[in-house]
Amino acid sequence: MKSGRKLSYVSIILALAAVLSMFLTGCSGNTDNRNVVYEDMKAAFEQANLLSANIGIFTKTVSGDSVSYGECGSGVIFDRDGNDYYALTAAHVVSAEGSQLLVFTVNTEMKTEDIPGIDYSVLSQDAYDAMYPAEVLYVSSRDDLAVIRFRAEEELSVIGIAEADPAKDDRIMCVGNPESAWFAISYGKVTSGMEKFGESQGFPSNAMRHSAYIQVGSSGGAAIGEDMKLVGITPGASLSPNGKTFRYGVLIPVSEIRLCLEEWNGSPSKE
């Protein structure tokens, strides 16, 4: 069992490197806005109790006696049917073949444990065991988007979807799990119109740039507008070559999200 645990640690580190490489687009310009806070949006978000609409996602892979967990991703709940919750995320977060999906919420206790011999800690097995199994219901044919479902007894919020795409200079807030900062919130503005992103990573998307700070672990997280409606899903960001400097984030806007949901609603696989 000890050898399995070591393989798990190695798999986590390798997964981190793999996901990080997806973010590096090689573009210049530093717009690190991690200390920006829009107090009015923060207050509206808290009043609407929307933090619990956001989730985190891990992949779990079992190979013989070894169990490994992939790097964290993010998502947001957009619908509910009883105890079944439906969430949007980035397709690349849930694309690992042969893996199980695990979802955690704001109420999941994220216990950690140290790795002997090195200054590094990972989530404990108790934390993973407390997460909810999830399934992929649909992967978009157009963008880095996916719909997943999980069942939970707890009461979680559902976010509404905006009617229109955000415009350049619109203020947004992003929610995700960057670098194991669970359910972190950042603020910024939309900085471009629609562009094509992600083609070199195999997950092309019609998306917009923004200045709200995101990092590894933010993939699939929510971008929220001033009216507290979902205006986009964040599939990634442009970072410096060493991964330490944020340049800009990317969001897939609601026009693309609605197309994804229309495709899903019309697909034979929808239950």
Where are these regions (language model features)?
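Catalytic-histidine neighborhood of serine endopeptidases
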Residues: 80-141, 247
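Bacterial N-terminal signal peptides that target proteins for export
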Residues: 2-13
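Active-site region of chymotrypsin-like
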Residues: 51, 55-65, 151-157, 184-264
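A conserved glycine-rich beta-strand in the N-terminal activation segment of trypsin-fold
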Residues: 38-41, 58-90, 132, 185, ...
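C-terminal cap/linker of serine protease catalytic domains
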Residues: 31-33, 37-44, 106, 110-121, ...
